[in-house]
Amino acid sequence: MNMAKDIKFSADARAAMVRGVDMLADTVKVTLGPKGRNVVLEKAFGSPLITNDGVTIAKEIELEDHFENMGAKLVSEVASKTNDIAGDGTTTATVLTQAIVHEGLKNVTAGANPIGIRRGIETATATAVEALKAIAQPVSGKEAIAQVAAVSSRSEKVGEYISEAMERVGNDGVITIEESRGMETELEVVEGMQFDRGYLSQYMVTDNEKMVADLENPFILITDKKVSNIQDILPLLEEVLKTNRPLLIIADDVDGEALPTLVLNKIRGTFNVVAVKAPGFGDRRKAMLEDIAILTGGAVITEDLGLELKDATMTALGQAAKITVDKDSTVIVEGSGSSEAIANRIALIKSQLETTTSDFDREKLQERLAKLAGGVAVIKVGAPTETALKEMKLRIEDALNATRAAVEEGIVAGGGTALITVIEKVAALELEGDDATGRNIVLRALEEPVRQIALNAGYEGSVVIDKLKNSPAGTGFNAATGEWVDMIKTGIIDPVKVTRSALQNAASVASLILTTEAVVANKPEPAAPAPAMPAGMDPGMMGGF
């Protein structure tokens, strides 16, 4: 049965959504900058989480009013998308969204055409992004990488760990962040590999908040066959069940009745199982499965060797210390394969590299070599309390993402300074009518991050912006000390990818809100009446329990 709906139109619809935008943005923006404050989040279980991570806060906010909640959810989407693309900049994106929505709403309410405004916003945003790319400086070398990581995590020590990890496993190498048993944070490089295949069903996750499946000390079934009939793997499942250890299935596919059966057993808690598709295609898939088997000390169950799934025994299963699976990738840490077998496999790939004449094959062989020989860097986070540990872990995850983004697209002056620098280019756009209004909205929004950073540090935003506009290029306001400095030399930097993604996502969602003419929400259902008391029962009797 369909629920009854509440519908609001034009100004009413937009006003309700903007109330939601404001509630979320006002909560998140207090965390912006070096003097940003913390937000305390109540948790259903355990102690509250204290954080200044924008996306973590945004995901927690759920409003009672359906219309307001839709506005809040749209801004939360901006934060999440920016986090997915660049790994940081979620608070900046939230502040920019709120600024564009507010400025835009004033003009729409005054009678401007929302479609014209949207066009102007899109043109101005594209110009600002190009201008950001033009002033970007490349990041290379261990020291520069450490500096970027230290700024994002607010800790020089963390900066050193991240640059060290990236040096040892490569910029695209696998770096995982785990909780340490001690008080100290430390870096360790272990044998491991990552491939680009995620879980086949989201019901297989073990951490619903992060939507990942963590398998400790698992067995690994590796096959190039399709698993459609659960009977084929039932004998193996029963053997694994006796050990009380989790299982990862890497197969050509898991479908038919096999997938729902596995999911059902996972949900019931019978056993912990995750299924993923095998990586690669054709002959390369066979080679990659063989790599995984050698790394984990297992065997590939394949028709090429005349092996059948139903005849497989526990000896064919690989093992590892830990496996993490998210929606897009699988990371195997410390496989149980023998060092000698792994070394032989690496030597084989190297000899193939020397003899191949195809550039494509060479690239794929190098990829396999990096996966086998590169290992996985593990940053083990230590802290005195569980609350501090969670906060530190979030900070390091942000820093790692920001550092990768910096290496990819370069850096610009931080603290919102780069957004002020590109104002000149955006202002030079020759637009007319509502398009020009859209451009002016973006011009005003570009000032907002600096204004908020100054405000959080106890300074007057307008004064700081005014002085910044009249300062030499590259000079900015260090909110931590209250001084005017050369931002990049001082190490106050932002990855271009972070700043660019924040602006693009904010402009996109804010434009959608401004062009909204109707909002449809579910009507809250009336509370069910309390069941009637059986006849002859004295209400006073209830007090005895």
Swiss-Prot record:
Taxonomy, superkingdom: Bacteria
Binding site for ATP: 31-34, 88-92, 415, 478-480, 494
Compartment(s) where it occurs, according to its Swiss-Prot or TrEMBL record: Cytoplasm
Any Pfam family matching the protein: Cpn60_TCP1
Catalytic activity: ATP + H2O + a folded polypeptide = ADP + phosphate + an unfolded polypeptide
Transmembrane segments: none
Keyword set includes Transmembrane helix: no
Gene3D superfamilies referenced in this protein's UniProt entry, alphabetically: GroEL, GroEL-like equatorial domain, TCP-1-like chaperonin intermediate domain
Swiss-Prot/TrEMBL keywords: ATP-binding, Chaperone, Cytoplasm, Isomerase, Nucleotide-binding
Purpose: Together with its co-chaperonin GroES, plays an essential role in assisting protein folding. The GroEL-GroES system forms a nano-cage that allows encapsulation of the non-native substrate proteins and provides a physical environment optimized to promote and accelerate protein folding.
Protein name: Chaperonin GroEL
